[in-house]
Amino acid sequence: MSEEKKGKILNAGKRLFLRYGYKRVSMSDIAEAAGISRPALYLVFKNKEEIFKGAYKQWVDEKIFEIEEKAETLNTAEKKLRLAFELGVIQLIEAMKTSPELKELVERNFGYGSRKFENLVERFLTPIAPRKLKKSSWTAERAAHLLVSAVPGFKQTAETSEDLRSLINDCVSLILSSWPRD
């Protein structure tokens, strides 16, 4: 199977899932949108669920890449973290409010996106993490896990996107200020 064909199918699936939702999209719809026959589609993917998961993973990977590219222009971990949470959480939650299809895509595959985002946050924290602390103390990995794990609770209590942004920014500031400078 060529990666080009697989990408074409995943892009077609992603467009259709975001437009119509999982239940209203058939394998025939995906094959037609990808410009291939239905039997050819089944040679690449066993079922619609596999395409759905693949389309979500592709979307997450693209979003992570976008954040990484934009973060390259920023000079502090705090700015990179604020950017990551703005693009990877706040804008996503805003878009999910108006798109039940996007909400379905994210919620059905939340674990993958959460792990990828947590890894991104950890990469932004690693260069500034304290190196002289005991193993059981704050690490970039633990701080990233705390930040990402706190977001669902913040989402539940925040009344507006601005409230959510403020809670996330406060948590970022709290973690960064708790680390001694080398």
Predicted regions and their residues:
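Amphipathic alpha-helical segments used for helix-helix packing
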Residues: K79-R115, Q156
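Short coil/turn segments at alpha/beta junctions that flank glycine-rich nucleotide-binding fingerprints
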Residues: R19-K23, L74, A95
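Helix-turn-helix
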Residues: K8, A12, L16, Y20-E50, ...
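Short, basic, alpha-helical segments at the C-terminal edge of helix-turn-helix-like DNA-binding modules
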Residues: K57-I64
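N-terminal intrinsically disordered/low-complexity leader segments
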Residues: M1-E3, D182
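Hydrophobic alpha-helical connector segments
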Residues: G54, I67-E94, A144-L147
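Hydrophobic/aromatic-rich alpha-helical bundle segments in the mid-to-C-terminal region
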Residues: S99-E104, K132-I175, D182
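Amphipathic alpha-helical packing segments from all-alpha helical-bundle domains
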Residues: D61, N109-H145
